[in-house]
Amino acid sequence: MEQIVGVRFKPAGKIYYFDGNDLELHLDDGVIVETSRGLEYGYVVTMPTEAEKDEENPMKPVIRRATIKDMAQLERNKAREKSAFDICLQKIEKFKVPMKLLRAEYTFDRNKIVFFFTSDGRVDFRELVKELAAVFHTRIELR
């Protein structure tokens, strides 16, 4: 048996399920989890429940409850996202890329910045990505 807990990364966002890792977790607790994007900070939104362990498709575990340091890191990331957004806008104008930037998100561990955008068609943003990677010294993803 494993303890399953629902975690949300954004208010009103999708709920993802993780192995509670035998941690004592409560609703609205901040937690650090491993996702396909890297380490992420989320909030517990469902009470932990017991479930059969699926050996073929194991759930990723909650790494730990969020600490005060983690909360401070989250706030620093939010501030950096604003700066990253502004810098990306400048680079979009510089390269005249036909896209509208929606938002920027750092992963919790700052291994990657994801820039969300819309465009009317396919966009060649290879030069933009190279420039952003040089500025931020981290992996860049455009979605």
Report each predicted region and the residues it spans:
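Acidic-enriched and Gly/Ser
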Residues: 1-143
